[in-house]
Each structure stands twice: as structure tokens, then as C-alpha cells.
Amino acid sequence: MANHKLWGGRFEASLEGWVEEFGASIGFDYRLAPYDLEGSLAHVKMLGQTGIIAPEEAAAIQAGLEKLLARYESGELEFDVRNEDIHMNMEALLTEKIGPVAGKLHTARSRNDQVATDMHLYLKDQLGQIADKLLNLRQVLLDLAEEHVETIMPGYTHLQHAQPISFAHHLLAYYQMFSRDSQRFAFNLEHTDLSPLGAAALAGTTFPIDRELTADLLGFKGIYHNSLDAVSDRDFILEFLSNSSILIMHLSRLCEELINWCSYEYGFVSLSDTFSTGSSIMPQKKNPDMAELIRGKSGRVYGHLFSLLTVMKSLPLAYNKDLQEDKEGMFDTVDTIQKSLDIMAGILSSMTVNKEKMLVSTQQDFSNATELADYLAKKGLPFREAHEIVGKLVLECSKAGYYLQDIPLSRYQEVSSLIEEDVYQALESQTAVQKRNSLGGTGFEQIRQELERAKKDLNNK
């Protein structure tokens, strides 16, 4: 049987259908279509300008590619699994449109540098969109923090009340995490903004190509300077998957807290109906499903990172078919991250904060114990002695069923003559938060300064 593949000259027999289907990637790499056309347009312009092909041939190919791009944008293009991948589908469609001259498009180019170029263009585009969505989420956090500088809530360690803090302080912690995520993706963009086009199969080409020209036409800031490296590594995708894993870990932690906070046990926030669902059997339920889904999707993003690391770990240079497995995880991670960022911004901007419940929660615990120890230390008692005294008072209160602010002054003075009437003000949650004005602390003045720094940072983006 004759082999009609574009690479079929060396073969006497064709692939059987089920084998062909196993090897095909058009079922997912169709997403690279506009980038494949963009890369081909740059390549054919270079071929024409360098005289590698005749000007009229370059013009015919360019016109054909532009028509294919228009058909793609209008949703008219249909792909064939028999053509394996997006590159061979596009070449087949181009040949159908303009005839045999289409075969000159692949001069001085391999599918190896072609697919690498497509993925660099695709990921560069998506990184820009992710950067914008991260910027929006950070703005939402800043707006919410500005509303709640003086909203007092319990701060936790080991999921137990530790010290009272400002709710804004808690939100700004996530702002800082997401800011570092933005920086990581910006570095990722630098490593992605390089053109592999012209590396050919692995060793470059004998044709007098102009790689700087194609890089410039495609909007890349530079080129790969080693042809083997250009076609055989996928570290720019691994970096993206790694950065995405860190980002969705941060999102997952925030989701976990929101899920807890909207429960009856906490009651700190109420999520909008837009981001909640009900139960098919329990009429009273309002479930934080969207937050739970973001938390759950962290697993699939981690999985894509581990999958590609495993694919890459033993690959010899240069191209191997294993690299076909680099795309689906990248595509899915892009979708997951972009949707998760949109959902998280929506959840935060629409939720209701129960300030009173947060404050009351700080008054029904021992999170002011550190304040009492600090109070004694400031009066000259060694902190370790103060810590011991307060620990015993907490034990006493726990057994009796009351809190430190409920202890009468007479009992305090039995414990230490250093304790005076002003101890009760020191034990108030508001006082505890306001006094923590060390750099980076939860004091209101520190938070306002941090908000100003963050606003300047965002405005410079």
C-alpha cells in the first residue's frame, strides 16, 4: 500500500488506523493552530527576503496562510487525524489551497523547531493573560484589606487561637504570596521569550536563513543560541508548571481558610450565592463548592508537573517522540490557573465579612496571653518568668471556665505586685493589635504603610 504521509517516502507500508490514532496529537495540539500559522508566516517571509525561495512563491504561500488564518478565526477549519498533528494538517490544508508550491514552506525547517516555536508563542501569550489575572486578584486583596484595617480576628498557629491580628494583615500575607507568584511568572516569560525557529531538526540548516529576522517578526526578544537546546528542552514549560503549582498551592491555602471561615463553627464570612451551591437532600446547605474545587484542582496541576518531569528525566538529546506528552498538561494547567484566578477574585470581591463575629472570637479565648506576658516583661520581669506566671493563670482560668480579662485585680496582684489596673486595657484585642507596630507587624499604622507600598507596586506594573 502506498504511503501518503508527508514523511512517507522511506516507507513501503502505511500505519494501521488504530496505530495512527495512537500516535496522533491533533486531538489536543489543534490549540496551537494560530501560533503555527503565525510561525509559518514569519518563516515564509524570511525565506522570500533571503532569496531561499522565489518572491512569487513566498507571496503565494503567504496569501494561502493568511486565508487559512481567516478560516481558523471564523471556525471553518477542520482537521484530519490522518495528518497526525497541527503542522501536517496545516501543510495539507495549504497544499489543498495553493497547490505544490506549499511544499516549499518547509524549506530550512523541521517539525522539531516548528513545534517548539508554536509552544513558545502559545505560552508567551498565556503568561501575559495569567499576569493580568494575578494583577487583578492582588488588587481585589488590596481593596478588601483597605476596608478591614481595623477588623480584628484571631491569628492562628496549629489551627488554634494564637494572637489577635487585623483581618487586613491576614489578607496582605496572601497579597505578598501572590506578588512573588507574579515575579516567578515574569521570570518564566523571560525564558519563554526566545525563538527556537531556525534550529531545524537539531543541527541547524545549510540554507542562509535569518533567525534574527524571524524572531523579530514573531515578537521574540531573542533567540536560542544552541540548536540542540532549542529543540530538545522543555524547561520553559516545566518552569511554568512549577510556578503554577506554587500559585495554586497559595490559592488552595486561601480556599481552605475561606471554607473554614464560612462554616457555622467560625461564621467569619459568608460567600456569595454566585460561588456556592446547595444539596440535593439537605435544604439548608450552602456549600463553598467553587473554593473546594480550586483546592481540589491543585492535585491535577501538581500531577502535570510530575508527569513532565518524569517524561524529561531520561531523554537523550535531541528530539524524541516522548515530547509529544508535553502539551496536554500545559494546556490543562493554563485553563485551570486562569479559571481559578478568576473564581478566586470573584469569591473575595463578593463575600460578606462578619466583623463582630471575628472580634467576639478573640474575646473568648486566651489569645491575649502573650499580651499579659509582655506586660510583665515591660515592667522588668524576665520574660521566661512572665511566661511561667501567665501559663499558670491560663490553666487556672481553663479549670474555672473564664478568661484572663475576667480575673479580678486582687487575684492578679496576689500573683505579682507588678500588675496594676492598666492590665485590662493591655488585654483588650484592639490594644493588642494596635501595639504590634514593629516593621511588618499587624499594627494598624504598619498595615496602612504596607497598603501604600503595595498600591505603588501595583501602579508600577
Swiss-Prot record:
<keyword id="KW-0963">Cytoplasm</keyword>
<dbReference type="InterPro" id="IPR008948">
    <property type="entry name" value="L-Aspartase-like"/>
</dbReference>
<dbReference type="GO" id="GO:0004056">
    <property type="term" value="F:argininosuccinate lyase activity"/>
</dbReference>
<keyword id="KW-0055">Arginine biosynthesis</keyword>
<dbReference type="InterPro" id="IPR029419">
    <property type="entry name" value="Arg_succ_lyase_C"/>
</dbReference>
<dbReference type="GO" id="GO:0042450">
    <property type="term" value="P:arginine biosynthetic process via ornithine"/>
</dbReference>
<dbReference type="GO" id="GO:0006526">
    <property type="term" value="P:L-arginine biosynthetic process"/>
</dbReference>
<comment type="pathway">
    <text>Amino-acid biosynthesis; L-arginine biosynthesis; L-arginine from L-ornithine and carbamoyl phosphate: step 3/3.</text>
</comment>
<keyword id="KW-0456">Lyase</keyword>
<dbReference type="InterPro" id="IPR000362">
    <property type="entry name" value="Fumarate_lyase_fam"/>
</dbReference>
<dbReference type="Pfam" id="PF14698">
    <property type="entry name" value="ASL_C2"/>
</dbReference>
<comment type="similarity">
    <text>Belongs to the lyase 1 family. Argininosuccinate lyase subfamily.</text>
</comment>
<dbReference type="InterPro" id="IPR022761">
    <property type="entry name" value="Fumarate_lyase_N"/>
</dbReference>
<dbReference type="InterPro" id="IPR024083">
    <property type="entry name" value="Fumarase/histidase_N"/>
</dbReference>
<protein>
    <recommendedName>
        <fullName>Argininosuccinate lyase</fullName>
        <ecNumber>4.3.2.1</ecNumber>
    </recommendedName>
</protein>
<dbReference type="GO" id="GO:0005829">
    <property type="term" value="C:cytosol"/>
</dbReference>
<dbReference type="Pfam" id="PF00206">
    <property type="entry name" value="Lyase_1"/>
</dbReference>
<dbReference type="InterPro" id="IPR020557">
    <property type="entry name" value="Fumarate_lyase_CS"/>
</dbReference>
<keyword id="KW-0028">Amino-acid biosynthesis</keyword>
<dbReference type="InterPro" id="IPR009049">
    <property type="entry name" value="Argininosuccinate_lyase"/>
</dbReference>
